[in-house]
């Protein structure tokens, strides 16, 4: 059994009707819905926002806080180009979900497993439902699954990275460049900004599958041999702050600690991005930004 999570199901996983196993989700407690969101623009007006006296102190290299209309509530070095680690898997999630066919099986190939940790441990020849793989990568950030989904989508990881750059521009992310699906530092030349990632956060909130996955606190991942692996969401704010509605973590030595997070309270939705934190303060600072945006 997975950790005891209030209000969450702990049913044992069952195989799907077509013989390809599926995980059993540990469902998050019901939370507020997101309102309609507006898409970012290359020419959006984002003059520097002077933090109010009661704004939280952010020690990370860059940060931004926006509302559901893209209005900036706080920013610090929001246009600095920085590595963003696994937070860019939100873009992977959007692209895979938009392609569709999530109920279809896909078979793991040998190159999919050539990934650095964090890894789920999938093996060549194994078959999984795409939705189960995508949910796992958004919850636990598994790099081998990210490679598999990228290859299945575009034929290869480099081709998928090129498609990521196209989709990023469509979302208004004009100051980002991606070279792989996972956020790892190789190949080099990969970067984004806090402002661009805030646009990605809005797009993630608009996508129903991604929105549901990123607020999932934990799930059982089921392998084809029937064994299961309990995994918990890497986003600690999702567990410490009851109004948090999820999003995505990231960490590499080069990027430091990165976090895209969101929260909802009293009909208001806010989105915070922190890049380049060198301490575990990323969690408390993210929560502080969310509370500030919600007027708490």
Could you describe each region identified by the protein language model?
Residues 69-70, 83-107, 111, 197:
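Active-site SXXK
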Residues 101-125, 216-222:
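Short, glycine/proline-biased beta-turn/loop segments that scaffold the active-site neighborhood
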Residues 78, 133, 275-276:
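Residue-level structural signal for beta-strand termini and adjacent loop
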């Amino acid at each position: 059994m997975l950790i005891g999570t209030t209000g969450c199901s702990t049913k044992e996983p069952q195989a799907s009707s077509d013989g390809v196993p599926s995980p059993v989700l540990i469902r998050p407690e019901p939370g507020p819905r997101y309102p309609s969101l507006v898409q970012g623009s290359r020419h959006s007006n984002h003059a520097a926002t002077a933090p109010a006296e009661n704004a939280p102190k952010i020690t990370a290299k860059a940060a931004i806080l926006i509302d559901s209309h893209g209005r900036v509530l706080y920013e610090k070095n929001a246009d600095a180009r920085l590595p963003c680690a696994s937070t860019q898997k939100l873009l992977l999630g959007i692209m895979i979900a938009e392609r569709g066919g999530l109920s279809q099986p896909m078979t793991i190939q040998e190159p999919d497993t050539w990934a650095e940790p964090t890894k789920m441990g999938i093996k060549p020849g194994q078959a999984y439902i795409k939705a189960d793989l995508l949910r796992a990568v958004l919850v636990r950030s598994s790099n081998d699954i990210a490679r598999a989904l990228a290859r299945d989508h575009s034929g290869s990881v480099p081709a998928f990275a090129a498609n990521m750059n196209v989709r990023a521009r469509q979302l208004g992310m004009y100051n980002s460049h991606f070279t792989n699906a996972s956020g790892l530092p190789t190949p080099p030349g990969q970067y984004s900004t806090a402002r661009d990632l805030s646009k990605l956060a809005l797009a993630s909130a608009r996508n129903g599958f991604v929105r549901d996955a990123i607020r999932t606190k934990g799930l059982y991942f089921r392998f084809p041999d029937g064994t299961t692996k309990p995994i918990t969401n890497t986003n600690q704010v999702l567990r410490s702050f009851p109004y948090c509605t999820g999003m995505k973590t990231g960490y590499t030595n080069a990027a430091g600690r990165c976090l895209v997070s969101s929260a909802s309270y009293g009909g208001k939705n806010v989105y915070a991005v922190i890049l380049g934190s060198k301490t575990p303060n990323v969690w408390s600072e993210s929560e502080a930004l969310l509370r500030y945006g919600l007027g708490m």
